């Protein structure tokens, strides 16, 4: 059974529907893998063993439903997404005992598709980070090298997929938090277009930037997951009415003939380590061999300008969103507070970690009367310029190809006290969130045994093209080895 946990979603689905494997034994195999590897990687905050096995037994007693693409398949979920009667902590002391009374919209979609929620994965506290080191429940470790970070903030989701603890995991992406950990863990990471997937029931970090998406081991699996998740939700006012596709069926292209790929010159800079630049350039050459035409383009505001813009807008929105955690309505409540003001101060001081407090303070500062025009208003203007840059280059190409991370996974603890250094690791990812565009991270090689990813950037609501091109490239790129766990 051990080999079955290495199968794709489509493969394990076929075995379950045909009754060649029972849902219970597949679920138990994933739980056994979690038990064996969790002491090493700490990918989960909550493991839903009892609930998952109970649901598996129910499904085994029912008639398999081939129309449900995730029927009987164990899926992991990032722990900032609400799950009814299952703790949802956002990896924070503030919510360590919080149990939601309803499911997020995307959890409903997973269940409607037949999925089994096997557990809630670790993350940077309130999804604020790039390494999954700021979690109240301890850091997650990279399955490829457990001395290194898995990336973040969806590091637990990426590590769980890379370690074969589940068949897919859901993450959220505010500035690269699906794509970057997927790249550092050798997985596929898809950030859909803003509005493609509902945010209802996701604990908000930055509402105009947040987007949920899948982390998988193949592009085909990402297409299956997106087909499940991408539905209009009237509970989310930013949820798109645009029609969605069966993204899996649409993976028809065999080569890249007729495709024009844009190469933004700003993404080839001193920020990127030379071995990663080599892999990126090899990916460009591979695309050409597969029939693509490449052209050099410019996105003048999409790197250094984007970092500053992102950290102003994201922290401003975080300051507003996290104001609700005050020790009164729900969440951590400090004891021995004699006044309401003391209760607020003590609850938030003890309930939030250092990085969350840093971002709240920064966001409050840029929204203050004296600094709003110079910071937040100016950042909103630059955000518009970033979007215009992308709209301009997409008149000349079908898709963009860039690096994901300027470096491979770094050693745990090496940058935790260097916030500016950590922020700059998002330099190739944040511009997509500011522009609301879809991005796909795929493995492209190894450097000293650590995975390197490349990023495909698509036009708004054209995930079909993004996945189709990514599927072709993934078959010719990336590590063929697996983490040695």
From Swiss-Prot:
Its EC number is 6.3.5.7. Heterotrimer of A, B and C subunits. PROSITE patterns: AMIDASES. PANTHER family: GLUTAMYL-TRNA(GLN) AMIDOTRANSFERASE SUBUNIT A, MITOCHONDRIAL, TRANSAMIDASE. This is Glutamyl-tRNA(Gln) amidotransferase subunit A. Disulfide bonds: none annotated. Belongs to the amidase family. GatA subfamily. GO terms for biological process: translation. Pfam families: Amidase. It catalyses: L-glutamyl-tRNA(Gln) + L-glutamine + ATP + H2O = L-glutaminyl-tRNA(Gln) + L-glutamate + ADP + phosphate + H(+). GO terms for cellular component: glutamyl-tRNA(Gln) amidotransferase complex. InterPro entries: Amidase, Amidase_CS, Amidase_dom, AS_sf, GatA. The active site is at 78 (charge relay system), 153 (charge relay system), 177 (acyl-ester intermediate). GO terms for molecular function: ATP binding; glutaminyl-tRNA synthase (glutamine-hydrolyzing) activity. Allows the formation of correctly charged Gln-tRNA(Gln) through the transamidation of misacylated Glu-tRNA(Gln) in organisms which lack glutaminyl-tRNA synthetase. The reaction takes place in the presence of glutamine and ATP through an activated gamma-phospho-Glu-tRNA(Gln). Keywords: ATP-binding, Ligase, Nucleotide-binding, Protein biosynthesis.
